[in-house]
């Protein structure tokens, strides 16, 4: 396999969208080498995002240009260039990509999925799943301190089930 991968991050997917549908939707832009919806390790349920890998750069860029902000299965999706797993990103912490902290990542602006340092996170702040999202405010998916030690699913600043702080899963 070549060192360069032309991979898109696709966020905001409906829970029902599967790998085959993702591939079918994006294959109109060029040859799709791989398409994968990311599932929760514990529940096996879609986490609402995935990746599509194209054979060439033009196909990837066309897909990003045409599909970012478009609707798929009733949801407005986000499509951008995925950060590579190696090197400069340091495991997705620098400037976007899955779990990235600065300026992007799933859930938008400053904070990745369940990031313990607050500011962004899964569906919070000004991005992700419709503005407020699960963790709402400055909390993220698990409230201020990630899933295990801050607010938990219903904690944080508002959160899915109201309440503030405490809780956890």
Swiss-Prot record:
<feature type="compositionally biased region" description="Gly residues">
    <location>
        <begin position="85"/>
        <end position="101"/>
    </location>
</feature>
<feature type="region of interest" description="Disordered">
    <location>
        <begin position="121"/>
        <end position="169"/>
    </location>
</feature>
<feature type="region of interest" description="Disordered">
    <location>
        <begin position="80"/>
        <end position="101"/>
    </location>
</feature>
<dbReference type="InterPro" id="IPR012677">
    <property type="entry name" value="Nucleotide-bd_a/b_plait_sf"/>
</dbReference>
<comment type="function">
    <text>Possibly has a role in RNA transcription or processing during stress.</text>
</comment>
<dbReference type="Pfam" id="PF00076">
    <property type="entry name" value="RRM_1"/>
</dbReference>
<dbReference type="InterPro" id="IPR000504">
    <property type="entry name" value="RRM_dom"/>
</dbReference>
<dbReference type="InterPro" id="IPR048289">
    <property type="entry name" value="RRM2_NsCP33-like"/>
</dbReference>
<dbReference type="GO" id="GO:0003723">
    <property type="term" value="F:RNA binding"/>
</dbReference>
<dbReference type="InterPro" id="IPR035979">
    <property type="entry name" value="RBD_domain_sf"/>
</dbReference>
<dbReference type="GO" id="GO:0016070">
    <property type="term" value="P:RNA metabolic process"/>
</dbReference>
<dbReference type="InterPro" id="IPR052462">
    <property type="entry name" value="SLIRP/GR-RBP-like"/>
</dbReference>
<keyword id="KW-0694">RNA-binding</keyword>
<feature type="domain" description="RRM">
    <location>
        <begin position="6"/>
        <end position="84"/>
    </location>
</feature>
<protein>
    <recommendedName>
        <fullName>Glycine-rich RNA-binding protein 10</fullName>
    </recommendedName>
</protein>
